[in-house]
Swiss-Prot record:
Pfam families: DUF150_C, RimP_N. The lineage of its organism: Bacteria, Bacillati, Bacillota, Clostridia, Eubacteriales. Belongs to the RimP family. This is Ribosome maturation factor RimP. NCBIfam families: PRK00092.1-2. It comes from Desulforamulus reducens (strain ATCC BAA-1160 / DSM 100696 / MI-1).
Length: 153
């Protein structure tokens, strides 16, 4: 089974559990690292999540995944916060973090670069609008590989 199929099935299955706990389902990843498979579920809420949030949701998700068995091989389940460099995937993510520093990578170089760090100005049908060193840059949606919050030091 393709990784994307696993992610889609798990996302669909766990979303009601996360919503019932009044939390946001930020992302689901299914990755192989060092010979082991990991199913990572990232959750959040205003003000940030606590260990109890992760534990409560993890237990319910674990039980559900045992029942529906959407993953073809053994894996480790991890439920956690998305962290300070959280991914931005949905339009609502970009709206929520408008004005924040973001790090965006593209599939192919745009003006000679595939990595862009700048202030998020807007997200619309045109693309993702950033301010980088005082200049506005628009990255078309179809060119964006990943988008994350960036840490200002």
């Amino acid at each position: 089974m393709a990784k994307s199929t696993v992610v889609e099935k798990v996302t669909e299955a766990v979303a009601p559990i996360v919503e019932e706990a009044k939390l946001e389902l930020v992302d689901v990843e299914y990755v192989k690292e060092g010979g082991n498979w990991y199913l990572r579920i990232f959750i959040d809420k205003p003000g940030g999540i606590e260990l109890d949030d992760c534990q409560g949701v993890s237990e319910k998700i674990d039980t559900l995944l045992d029942e529906i068995d959407p993953v073809p091989q053994a894996y480790f389940l991890e439920v956690s916060s998305p962290g300070i460099e959280r991914p931005l995937k949905k339009p609502q993510d970009f709206e929520k973090f408008n004005g924040h520093l973001v790090n965006i990578t593209t599939f192919a170089p745009i003006n000679g670069s595939k990595n862009f760090i700048g202030k998020l100005l807007d997200y619309n049908e045109e693309g993702i609008h950033l301010e980088i060193k005082g200049k506005q840059v628009v990255l078309p949606h179809q060119q964006v590989a990943t988008a994350r919050l960036a840490v200002e030091i």
